[in-house]
């Protein structure tokens, strides 16, 4: 969200510096807003303390818990890659109503949670999930390594949203493998039944690795990967400002 603010204000060169600082837990924009919030904090504390004296029901002041930058925030972040993709793909799965949907590596606290509201979903992820959630069946596995024949043509619907770009990068404890994304995509294809639906997202642009965050894929390369395996029903993307462009004609610019 804060990177999008820098984008929209024409300060994109600062994003690299901002990312570097946040790696070490330093958030300059949040720090600036927190400093701006100090006068409001003091003023409101004094006002509330005065009003407490005449209140019928008392709430005693306990530990101080300053939230100095919240007054400068919106009511949630209603844009960005994850926000739009999670809602878009959840809507499509609701409309298609598959018999068995499997998700691989997407956010449990976003997209998977959306699905769990209205249907059961099986989740495969190299990361652990330590709690039980209604409608979610979790299996910890490395999708680069799976050779389990029981999973071949296992489901009629599968998703992997902003996950494959990480395969083999080592970021989440997976073994480093330069071709990890290919192994993952091949296994996803094997898990899906013939004529099944595959919902997929990765970063797109000039092809590169931004280590150790992710890979970025060119459209031409993705189309080459998929041409003999899938028919593309629809293509949507989220731009650098976090806005969704839905059902767009594909162009191989990169």
Regions picked out by a protein language model, each given a short descriptive name:
Residues 72-78, 166-180, 208-209:
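Surface-exposed cleft-lining segments at the edges of enzyme active sites
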Residues 5-100, 111, 211-229, 233-254:
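N-terminal accessory regions of S-adenosyl-L-methionine
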Residues 195-203:
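Conserved beta-strand signature within the Rossmann-like core of class I S-adenosyl-L-methionine
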Residues 100-146:
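Class I SAM-dependent methyltransferase SAM/SAH-binding core
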């Amino acid at each position: 969200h804060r990177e999008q603010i820098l984008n929209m204000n024409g300060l994109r060169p600062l994003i690299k510096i901002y990312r570097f600082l946040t790696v070490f837990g330093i958030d300059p924009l949040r720090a600036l807003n927190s400093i701006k919030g100090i006068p409001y904090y003091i003023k409101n504390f004094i006002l509330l303390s005065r009003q407490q004296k005449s209140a019928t029901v008392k709430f005693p002041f306990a530990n101080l818990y300053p939230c100095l930058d919240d007054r400068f925030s919106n009511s949630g972040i209603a844009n960005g890659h994850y926000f739009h993709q999670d809602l878009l793909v959840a809507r499509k799965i609701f409309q298609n109503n598959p018999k068995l949907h499997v998700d691989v590596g997407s956010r449990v606290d976003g997209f998977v949670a959306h699905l769990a509201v209205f249907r059961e979903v099986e989740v495969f992820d190299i990361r652990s999930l330590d709690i039980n959630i209604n409608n979610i069946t979790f299996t910890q596995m490395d999708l680069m390594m799976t050779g389990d024949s029981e999973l071949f043509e296992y489901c009629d619907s599968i998703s992997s949203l902003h996950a494959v770009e990480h395969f083999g990068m080592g970021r989440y404890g997976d073994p480093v493998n330069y071709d990890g994304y290919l192994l993952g995509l091949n296994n996803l294809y094997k898990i899906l039944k013939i004529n099944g639906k595959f919902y997929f997202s990765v970063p797109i642009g000039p092809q590169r690795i931004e280590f150790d965050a992710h890979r970025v894929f060119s459209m031409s390369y993705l189309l080459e990967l998929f041409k003999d395996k899938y028919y593309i029903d629809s293509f949507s993307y989220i731009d650098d400002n976090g806005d969704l462009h839905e059902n767009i004609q594909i162009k191989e610019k990169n």
